[in-house]
Amino acid sequence: MGPLQREGRPALGDANVAPGSSPGGVWHQPQPPKDSAFHPMGWSLPKEKGLILCLWNKFCRWFHRRESWAQSRDEQNLLQQKRIWESPLLLAAKENNVQALIKLLKFEGCEVHQKGAMGETALHIAALYDNLEAAMVLMEAAPELVFEPMTSELYEGQTALHIAVINQNVNLVRALLARGASVSARATGSVFHYRPHNLIYYGEHPLSFAACVGSEEIVRLLIEHGADIRAQDSLGNTVLHILILQPNKTFACQMYNLLLSYDGGDHLKSLELVPNNQGLTPFKLAGVEGNIVMFQHLMQKRKHIQWTYGPLTSTLYDLTEIDSSGDDQSLLELIVTTKKREARQILDQTPVKELVSLKWKRYGRPYFCVLGAIYVLYIICFTMCCVYRPLKPRITNRTNPRDNTLLQQKLLQEAYVTPKDDLRLVGELVSIVGAVIILLVEIPDIFRLGVTRFFGQTILGGPFHVIIVTYAFMVLVTMVMRLTNSDGEVVPMSFALVLGWCNVMYFARGFQMLGPFTIMIQKMIFGDLMRFCWLMAVVILGFASAFYIIFQTEDPDELGHFYDYPMALFSTFELFLTIIDGPANYDVDLPFMYSITYAAFAIIATLLMLNLLIAMMGDTHWRVAHERDELWRAQVVATTVMLERKLPRCLWPRSGICGREYGLGDRWFLRVEDRQDLNRQRIRRYAQAFQQQDDLYSEDLEKDSGEKLEMARPFGAYLSFPTPSVSRSTSRSSTNWDRLRQGALRKDLQGIINRGLEDGEGWEYQI
């Protein structure tokens, strides 16, 4: 027993001694009382305090979850390197030291299956550092390492094949596949999840890894060895879904085509129609994510060119998954309900733009105008019913000199007697029926979209949905109070009037001039004004308390604005909004601190905070003004989808052409005539001429590099250019002509060559 070992307790090295006992006898750990919680420091706590401590610990863990996750990830990476340096086998695999590996593997005490801090084997490390020779030695000595996955929470399930694929080590991939590596292994660690703090999302299978890094050779190898192109990860995403989410759009389109070339066999459904867990196909996911490149690439597969007549082209576009008719989760509805701004750019793409324009002009705008007119008549009817509500002279005597009430509400038996009352009753019934219809229309959408999405989406008119639902409830509350002869019906009636008339602004979205302004008002109220109210509340609370303390010892008859604390708060609020001036009686002596406090309040409230609010609103106006066309298109789509969903099919026929009548199957199509600019064809011819000149120019440079540039460029045989002038206009024209030439020769700007014509000073080249 060591000198520091407590008597009666086992030493730390006594592995055969059971916990709670000692070699010389039995030692029992003291048990806490049944009605208390045991603290780790050794004393007992009451059960209630133990529960509070447990809840506090859970709250702390929840609050620091993200920071602790990042810190844990950093610590594990450092521990991984430390573990590699401590293990000769892992270090030899990292440094590709084949001789050391052979010696270690021949040693009987060497554990070939030893793992590092991440649960990785030596083969994982060799694959991570692209050490093919070391990996071959390890696979020869222990072939079962090929099937070993990593076991840490971060990289759980990752095999050496995953690492070789993502590093695009083709030779190592071939070696692993030759030794039976599983092509269906799934990497399910937290690093591979689709989360904001993860930099990459490549799915879980080796095939999706290969497709995302753009290795065509590895993709073919994996498919030839039995990789399932229809495999889905934990989110239900196939490899096509995962390609949609990649930032590199160019090779994503190439991999998309390559994978589709392997789709076929006995499957009845195309790989492009396989949905994920959210019910989104790759095409819909491209629209929701705002991936314009992939969306246009997929639309090229869906279009059928009928004929071309000079600059005119007639094209049939397949409306499957785009049109909201007959699809509960169409692309149009997904775009207007998503929170990503990039998705709204899809609304300006063909054929979505043409489909929305057709629906809006043919059905949406007329029905929306009729609906707006009906609502205005309805709210006028409700207003008249409120204005002429049943009142009678007051019967009771006044008991308070401040009470100036002359009329009071009639009882239910007295409210409907005269012909005027009957006319008002008709209007009240119309108001109640309208409120019930509003709730029947709005409540199903709340359950379908969810409360957060339905009331929080500005494009869907979220705040207006809150207004109209609250209005309907206020009307029903007013009805209940009228039927029960309850006093105070003026409260819900007043709220209903304000909310009902404010909802008229919702119908401004039907006009391009007024629609964006409704969004501007929403953003100012729920963005700028809400933040400003927090600052205003702090300032008012501070200065109201100061004013109350200053006038606390004064005569309230002389200085009545601050005689109690609630009145001080209200008076300070009026001062803040400059409704009243300094509410002080200057005929008497005022406290010295009043002048100082009021001067500071005037500077902070009037000069600083009100101008801050104006600046914030101006910034919001500037941002919304730059998006007004895009926002209005989104409003039109949201309104069109809403009307199409609510109206019966007989009032809203399906748009487009049914393919069944023309031998195109059961799909619906939209015919679009497009006129191509002939200047593009001219620019292409110029581009070809310039390309030939560049080839000749490069050949001349190789023959004689000592000649001058003007002598080496044989432009005269092809194009004649004006002699450069020193004037500003000629110099500018020459500069833009050179930009045109450079833009025409770039491979990645075909079709958008005119972007090269923009001048730095805002001048545009005219063709």
UniProtKB/Swiss-Prot annotation:
In the UniProt record, which is one GO cellular component term?
calcium channel complex
Q: Where in the cell is it found?
A: Cell membrane
Positions contributing to Ca(2+) binding: D581
Q: What InterPro entries is this protein classified in?
A: Ankyrin_rpt, Ankyrin_rpt-contain_sf, Ion_trans_dom, TRPV, TRPV5/TRPV6, TrpV6
The residue ranges crossing the membrane are: 367-387, 425-447, 463-482, 489-508, 529-551, 596-616
Query: What ranges are annotated Extracellular (topological domains)?
Result: 388-424, 483-488, 552-564, 585-595
User: In this UniProt entry, which residues form the Cytoplasmic topological domain(s)?
Assistant: 1-366, 448-462, 509-528, 617-767
User: What name appears for this protein in its UniProt entry?
Assistant: Transient receptor potential cation channel subfamily V member 6
Which catalysed reactions does the entry list for this protein? Answer: Ca(2+)(in) = Ca(2+)(out)
**Glycans attached where?**
N397
List Phosphotyrosine occurrences by residue. Y201, Y202
Q: Topology versus the membrane, per the UniProt entry? A: Multi-pass membrane protein
> Which GO molecular function annotations are given, in alphabetical order?
calcium channel activity; calcium-activated cation channel activity; calmodulin binding; identical protein binding; metal ion binding
Region annotated Interaction with calmodulin sits at 133-143, 689-707
Quaternary form? Homotetramer. Probably also forms heterotetramers with TRPV5. Interacts with TRPV5. Interacts with S100A10 and probably with the ANAX2-S100A10 heterotetramer. The interaction with S100A10 is required for the trafficking to the plasma membrane. Interacts with calmodulin. Interacts with BSPRY. Interacts with TCAF1 and TCAF2.
The organism that produces this protein has a lineage beginning with:
Eukaryota, Metazoa, Chordata, Craniata, Vertebrata
Q: How is it modified after translation?
A: Glycosylated.
The region called Interaction with S100A10 is annotated at 637-641
Q: Which NCBIfam families match?
A: trp
Tissues in which the UniProt entry reports expression = Expressed in duodenum, proximal jejunum, cecum, and colon.
